[in-house]
């Protein structure tokens, strides 16, 4: 097996892990949506979203990760959370 094939297998495993985590995150977002509905709260919470963005940008600094890519990914996650809520 070539080095490229080994790396591709590793990437595939990581991608599968990410999908499992995305499903877990989506399930939790649905639960949050149900609770918000029962409490008469609006779905979107700008304060919480800003708090999460700030925490994730700090995490990017700590691990040396591209903030632009992280912000795009986080925006995707937040948009999907709002959709399922």
Sequence positions of predicted segments:
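Domain-level signature for soluble enzymes in the chorismate/prephenate branch of the shikimate pathway
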Residues: 1-85
